[in-house]
Structure formats: C-alpha cells, structure tokens
C-alpha cells in the first residue's frame, strides 16, 4: 500500500532528540548517545512502533534502536514514545541495506525482525532481511552469542530462513510454528500480529544465536 506523503513528518522528527537522522556518525558511539553502558537491542523494520514501545517500557535498563525507511511510518513511532515519555529508544530513518555502516563491532546484543517482506519470487530472495547477504552484514556488529529473534507468518520465508541462519554461522536455539500456542512466554505482539492473529493467522518464531 502506498503511503501518503507527510511533508510535516521530517521537521517534527528532526526537532526531537529521539530521532537520529545522521546515524552513520554514531557508529561506535551509541553508548555515548544513551549516556549509559546498558546493552543495545535493534529492531529492523519497526513499523508503527507498538512492539518497540512495549519492549522499552518493560525493559528500562535496555537501550533500543528502531529502524525503518519511511518518515510517514516513523512519525507514529516518535509520537508513541513521546506520549509514554520513553527515553531508552532512538529512531533511525534508514535503508536497512546500509545498517552495518551504523554500528561498530559488538555494539548490538540482540536483533528483532518482525514480519518482514517475504519476497517470495526467487529472483528477489536476496532482499529478505534474513538472507545470508543481510546476515553477513549483521555479524559485523552483533556480539558473539548475540541473538536474532525472527517472527513471520510466511511458511516459505520461515523454512528458507532456517537454512540461511545455519549457513551463516547461527544455531537455532528455539523454534515454533505456532507461537501463540507454544510455551514461549516473552512474546510482545506487533500491530500486524494483533490484527491477523484474531483472524486465525499463525505466527512462526525462532531464536538464532551467533556461534
């Protein structure tokens, strides 16, 4: 669905200290930005920010970076954070293809990828955020033994991703084909997940650990 351009979004975002519009200048300096030594978790494709908001509220001693491309989406993330007075999140407008230019080695402890585009056509597979091409980029800044938490409702993407993780030096620590009927207790639902679970959608989930 094409988003209607919100010309007012960028000025509002640039006026907030929660939004980092020049993230490449922060490489290796994220702890300085957060003004503490807490671990940093990264969400790739944060959407409207419901997941990130809940994570940050439940874990005030963890710092979070929320990345997405469109100002038209990220402005809603910013407003959620301001409404709840959340200070342990930074919003980054960025094409994820450039993510390794933003973080230094060992700077990120955990990555969340929730319901990314499945890119089902073979010629588009390399655009998947779990493809080996992207995993190799994440390994440049993910700590040893760091984790990627991955959720999807697309069976093809889920099964292909298991192979991508294994080929890229990750071990699968947890996996379920029906998250909401599993024994996993630490799930926070995204807006998409909430809507479509009520319509019968099954969510698949895995935790991959960097060896």
UniProtKB/Swiss-Prot annotation:
The UniProt keyword set, sorted, is: Methyltransferase, S-adenosyl-L-methionine, Transferase, tRNA processing
Please give the organism: Clostridium tetani (strain Massachusetts / E88)
The reactions it catalyses are: guanosine(46) in tRNA + S-adenosyl-L-methionine = N(7)-methylguanosine(46) in tRNA + S-adenosyl-L-homocysteine
S-adenosyl-L-methionine is among the record's keywords: yes
Q: Which CDD domains match?
A: AdoMet_MTases
Query: Region (Interaction with RNA) spans which residues?
Result: 123-128
HAMAP family for this protein: tRNA_methyltr_TrmB
Give the gene that encodes this protein.
Answer: trmB
SUPFAM superfamilies on file = S-adenosyl-L-methionine-dependent methyltransferases
- Give the protein's function: Catalyzes the formation of N(7)-methylguanine at position 46 (m7G46) in tRNA.
Q: Name one GO cellular component term.
A: tRNA methyltransferase complex
Q: What is this protein called?
A: tRNA (guanine-N(7)-)-methyltransferase
Specify the pathway.
tRNA modification; N(7)-methylguanine-tRNA biosynthesis
Q: What is an example of a GO molecular function annotated in this UniProt entry? A: tRNA (guanine(46)-N7)-methyltransferase activity
In terms of superkingdom, the source organism counts as Bacteria
Family statement drawn from the similarity comment of this UniProt entry? Belongs to the class I-like SAM-binding methyltransferase superfamily. TrmB family.
Q: Which residues bind S-adenosyl-L-methionine?
A: 43, 68, 95, 117
Positions with a binding annotation for substrate: 121, 153, 190-193
Q: What is its EC number?
A: 2.1.1.33
């Amino acid at each position: 669905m094409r988003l209607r351009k919100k010309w007012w979004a960028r000025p509002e975002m640039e006026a907030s200290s929660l939004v980092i519009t020049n993230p490449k200048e922060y490489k290796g300096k994220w702890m300085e930005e957060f003004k503490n030594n807490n671990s940093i978790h990264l969400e790739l494709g944060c959407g409207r920010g419901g997941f990130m908001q809940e994570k940050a509220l439940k874990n005030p001693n963890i710092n979070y970076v929320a990345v997405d491309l469109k100002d038209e989406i990220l402005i809603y993330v910013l407003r959620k954070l301001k409404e709840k007075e959340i200070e342990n999140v930074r919003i980054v407008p960025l094409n994820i293809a450039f993510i390794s230019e933003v973080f230094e080695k060992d700077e990120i402890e955990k990555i969340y990828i929730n319901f990314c585009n499945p890119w089902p056509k073979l010629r588009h597979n390399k655009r998947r955020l779990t493809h080996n091409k992207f995993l190799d980029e994440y390994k440049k800044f993910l700590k040893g033994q760091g984790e990627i938490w991955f959720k999807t409702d697309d069976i093809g993407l889920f099964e292909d991703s298991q192979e991508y993780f294994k080929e890229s030096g990750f071990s699968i620590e947890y996996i379920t084909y029906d998250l909401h009927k599993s024994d996993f207790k630490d799930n926070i639902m995204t807006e998409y997940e909430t809507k479509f679970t009520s319509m019968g959608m099954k969510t698949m989930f895995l935790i991959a650990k960097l060896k």
